[in-house]
Amino acid sequence: MEVMKYEVVIKTDLKDRPKDHELSAALILADYFKSDVVFLRPQLDKTPDIDVNGMSWEIKSPKGNGKKTIDNNFRTARKQSLNIIMDLRRIKMHQSKAKARIDFFLSTPHHFKKVLIITKSNKIVEIL
């Protein structure tokens, strides 16, 4: 039986091409969704990063260790898409602490439809 392969499609130019961590996240997501991942060309400042099966997603890859790092990333992301992927591979705080901050933020009123986490071990966890 042949293994299905999925593509990461970049519809952009050099000026606004995806960063390396976004590309590696897209490869993980293509395998998770069993679908092609299309990087969307930025129309304005606040547009989602990718499209998977007609659903727009914003990828956030926080790097900090501060108390508000996760909260600030969610606040920025909600202006871009209702579906968020929080990539924890670059974050300086411990993964369990970051997960606790995500759970705390999502316990307050929000408008997100879907929230996924990419763990430091490249696994995807569905939160919402």
Regions found by a protein language model. Give the residues of each.
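Conserved catalytic cores of phosphodiester-cleaving nucleases, focusing on short active-site segments
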Residues: 50-63
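Metal-dependent nuclease catalytic core centered on acidic motifs
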Residues: 1-36, 63-128
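A short acidic/basic microdomain associated with nuclease active sites
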Residues: 30-49
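Short, solvent-exposed polar/charged micro-motifs at secondary-structure junctions
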Residues: 47-52, 125-127
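Short His-Asn-centered micro-motif
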Residues: 40-41, 59, 87-88
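Short, well-structured alpha-helical interface segments that form or flank functional binding sites
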Residues: 20, 24, 45, 54
